[in-house]
């Protein structure tokens, strides 16, 4: 845990050097940490980090523990980024912003002139199962550019088995994580498919991510005119092609909106920290199911 937090501090130092700012110029850091347990139904969510240490190492106030207040109000504690997406990415036409991390989630944004109601939720696994399988079979941390998966074929029988997971039929808002889509979940779904070439399994897992995303968008954002993608999944070309095939001409990355895909989530948690400092709510109850708007986070002074 201390190693992770020293990396946060090191990254902060590099960013300050690049921008010419000093710690005194920064109001606070929004530090999320690594989620290791997310059980909102049981009333808790747990992220590994040491915000007091980050504050000590950087000399900057830290806002952390950004999910638990929403959970305490009966919410899912996730996803939190739709509020930021709405603030930054709302346009003149209905849009969907898709974040593909370990888990994939969408923000359904009405046009600026329409009802302000915003929807959002986790569609299911993003890179999580793809990476699990890649690491198990090839030893690589991830399938670079989706090249290994591209060498395989989609198994319709395996895909149907994967898609039978009840979570996928639930309406948004909803959230999920490694508690459900674990290596054990994958192993159980692979039973009876042992003869499949491993590259076919890889390609089918890519299709699972693409299909659960596109099914959710079609179900809850049928009028969306634009789909913008962010997160690490944008660098999996096979996955991006699979998604774009369902939305020809509508799909781009958030780079087109002025925010690099790998910076969106970091910007979102900086924005949540800013909301905390201003005593403003950071959640969207329509997205998380919380009882109402809540100020998210806890302060760790420098």
Q: Predicted segment positions?
A:
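Conserved ATP-utilizing enzyme core subdomain
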Residues: 115-210, 214, 278, 288, ...
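Phosphate/ATP-binding catalytic cores across multiple sugar-kinase/actin-like superfamilies
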Residues: 7-18, 198-223
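Conserved small/polar residues in nucleotide/adenosyl-binding loops
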Residues: 1-6
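Glycine-rich phosphate-binding loops at beta-strand->alpha-helix junctions
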Residues: 36, 224-243
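Conserved phosphate-binding/catalytic loops in two-lobed NTP-binding clefts
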Residues: 244-268
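Phosphate-binding/catalytic loop of phosphoryl-transfer enzymes
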Residues: 40-45, 52-56, 60-141, 295
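Short Gly/Thr/Asp-enriched flexible loops that form oxyanion-binding sites at enzyme active sites
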Residues: 35-52, 239-244
């Amino acid at each position: 845990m201390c190693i992770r937090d020293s990396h946060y501090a090191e990254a902060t130092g590099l960013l300050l050097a690049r921008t010419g700012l000093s710690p005194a110029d920064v109001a606070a850091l929004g530090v999320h940490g690594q989620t290791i347990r997310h059980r909102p139904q049981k009333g808790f969510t747990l992220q590994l980090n040491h915000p007091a240490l980050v504050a000590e190492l950087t000399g900057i106030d830290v806002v952390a523990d950004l999910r638990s207040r929403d959970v305490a109000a009966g919410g899912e504690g996730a996803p939190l980024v739709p509020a930021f997406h709405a603030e930054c990415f709302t346009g003149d036409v209905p849009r969907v912003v898709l974040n593909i991390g370990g888990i994939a989630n969408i923000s359904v944004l009405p046009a600026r002139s329409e009802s302000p109601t915003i929807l959002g939720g986790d569609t299911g696994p993003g890179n999580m199962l793809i990476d699990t399988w890649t690491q198990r079979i090839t030893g690589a941390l991830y399938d670079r550019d989706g090249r290994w998966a591209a060498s395989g074929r989609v198994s319709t029988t395996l895909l149907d088995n994967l898609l039978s997971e009840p979570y996928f039929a639930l309406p948004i808002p909803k959230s999920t994580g490694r508690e459900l889509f674990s290596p054990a979940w994958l192993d159980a779904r692979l039973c009876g498919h042992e003869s499949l070439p491993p590259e076919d399994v890889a390609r089918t897992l890519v299709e699972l991510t693409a299909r659960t995303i596109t099914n959710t968008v079609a179900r809850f954002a049928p009028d969306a005119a634009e789909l913008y993608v962010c997160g690490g999944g944008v660098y999996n070309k096979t996955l991006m092609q699979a998604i774009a095939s369902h939305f020809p001409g509508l799909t781009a990355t958030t780079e087109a909106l002025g925010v690099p895909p790998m910076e969106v989530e970091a910007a979102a948690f900086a924005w949540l920290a800013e909301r905390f400092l201003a005593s403003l709510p950071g959640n969207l109850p329509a997205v998380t199911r919380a009882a109402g708007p809540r100020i998210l986070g806890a302060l760790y002074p420098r």
